[in-house]
Amino acid sequence: MNRIFRNTIFYLLIFLVIVGIVSVFNSDQTETENVSFNEFAERLENGQVQELSVKPERQVYLVRGQFNDQAEDEFFQTYALRSEQTAELLFNAEDPTGTPFNLEIEPADETSGWVQFFTGIIPFIIIFILFFFLLSQAQGGGSRVMNFGKSKAKMVNEDKKKAKFKDVAGADEEKQELVEVVEFLKDPRKFSAIGARIPKGVLLVGPPGTGKTLLARAVAGEAGVPFFSISGSDFVEMFVGVGASRVRDLFENAKKNAPCIIFIDEIDAVGRQRGAGLGGGHDEREQTLNQLLVEMDGFSANEGIIIIAATNRADILDPALLRPGRFDRQIQVNRPDVNGREEVLKVHARNKPLNDDVNLKTIATRTPGFSGADLENLLNEAALVAARHDHTKISMIHIEEAIDRVIAGPAKKSRVISPKEKKIVAWHEAGHTVVGVKLENADMVHKVTIVPRGMAGGYAVMLPKEDRYFMTQPELLDKIIGLLGGRVAEEVTFGEVSTGAHNDFQRATGIARKMVTEYGMSEKLGPMQFISGSGGQVFLGRDIQNEQNYSDAIAHEIDLEVQRIIKECYARCKQILLENKDSLDLVAKTLLDMETLDAEQIKSLVHEGKLPDDHHLNAHLEKEKASESDVKVNINSKKEETPQVEAEQPQEPNTDEPIEKDPSVEDNRSFEDDTNKKE
């Protein structure tokens, strides 16, 4: 009702302004000259007045008329005292022809002075009110011109608290930390009886997609107390002082509803380090941060208010914000391990019909490094693939296809690839595959394909045998050797190389440099860490670069050590492929024929020199049939013929034929997917 009333007043004011503007433009725009009464009397006597009207006022006559002695008739007005002599002059006046004027006597204006006063100021009042409404309508987010300093925090209603702790999986320890906060709010005597103090602030830190906001929503659903939610970017806006004002208003509202919880999402937007770095001198943001520090733990205590914040950039937060008394507890929300991934998959599979062949444990093993958001997206993609084939349940084939789509993008079987490039891709991926199988400490080769997906012309999926949180020196060296396998395979097979190993070199060089500069794995330089000013990220609130803690001579030694590691790994990789040249050619020829090989087929080819039995081969072909949906989609719900892809017949590589170094090859092929780095 209040909104309808405001809209009615607003449109009424617009109507009045339009009427006023129209009346002004439609009024008599004729110019009128003010003349003295003596001049008027003289012209009247000379017969130069052709129209005349008289309007009696309090003590004078208002005389209006028109002269006829100009090229253009001129209108005039004058004032005359009300006397018998003036009345005789006016009422006996004659026009130039000697005919007495048909004198028009206008009625006297009996309007009071107060009415005239208010009539003059009403237009200004209307303009002021209209300006006020225009400003109020211009304020975003439903706020008004006089309350832009109010907090934008939203109190979560009871009916909207849908998330519970049972909806959070794969983060048992993190969930337990927050369960204590909820228990304190429900039964504070349990903790106060032994002198315990609940943390004033809890900071959730972790990579994107790990469930930090979901944990906060679960706290809101379980707490049973008022829950305020706000984003860190909602504090600072265009007006100076708004940020600090909104912080004060937020805590004032929280005090009125204590005990309560305040959740600040992406707190790094307002809690960046203060300093002279790039953007570090932002006075408005620093003022907002200072006010937040005072409200969290300042001179006046805020009892019963618990603050939960989330960020994925804890390294750039101000140290004063992280000290005990403000954020007493920091909870690291990492990506789930294999057991956590299985629990997350169970949560997201509740409303999805799964076929009997779906094994969530196997999927969890196949997806190392996936966050909770990645796993949710994976099952959603699998459901979309199943719906595309008009299936009523999600099978393992659909999930395998969804994993490939999430890792490398949709298959592009319609992409035209020349036989020469297809041959290069096949031997390149076969090189990665054979080296990965033969190395003891390398990641397990799970799948290899030459089917283009996304920007990749082919890729090999290398998965760790188990979840790990650190790597040994032999494992790092074997990883470099595996990355160089594609380039070495091209060299030993064709005698020339292509640009397809661009990403492989980038990653291999990065690992080797970290071994020397960060991990202390160089025998020549010893167990030391060398910090480079250009290696860190540039962000607001901190210096642009760190000082280099080593000399130019040491920098030269670092380059030599990195070069030595790469060359030794390259030589080792070349030795492996030359010793297993038959396996390399067999895998490459089979890839040209089948395009995709799974882990069991790869092991059988390398160790036994043949493919496994027909049962497994048929399962593989059925998987390939499911991926055909990326080429043709049945829009009209009618069955279409599956396009027949003619596979190139395996041929011995022609080493005499030169390889064209087309720069487009680099753009079309990224032979090994980055996700095999996930550990």
UniProtKB/Swiss-Prot annotation:
Binding residues annotated for Zn(2+), in chain numbering: 428, 432, 504
Annotated positions binding ATP: 206-213
EC number of the protein: 3.4.24.-
Biological process, per Gene Ontology: protein catabolic process; proteolysis
Main subcellular location: membrane
Pfam families per UniProt: AAA (PF00004), AAA_lid_3 (PF17862), FtsH_ext (PF06480), Peptidase_M41 (PF01434)
Listed GO MF terms: ATP binding; ATP hydrolysis activity; ATP-dependent peptidase activity; metalloendopeptidase activity; zinc ion binding
Record topological domains on the Cytoplasmic side: 1-6, 136-679
A single Gene Ontology CC term: plasma membrane
PROSITE patterns noted in UniProt: AAA
Active site: 429
Location(s), subcellular: Cell membrane
Topological type in the membrane: Multi-pass membrane protein
Membrane topology, Extracellular segments: 28-114
Biological role stated in the UniProt entry: Acts as a processive, ATP-dependent zinc metallopeptidase for both cytoplasmic and membrane proteins. Plays a role in the quality control of integral membrane proteins.
Assigned protein family: In the central section; belongs to the AAA ATPase family. In the C-terminal section; belongs to the peptidase M41 family.
Quaternary structure (record): Homohexamer.
NCBIfam families: FtsH_fam
The protein, known as: ATP-dependent zinc metalloprotease FtsH
Chain's gene name: ftsH
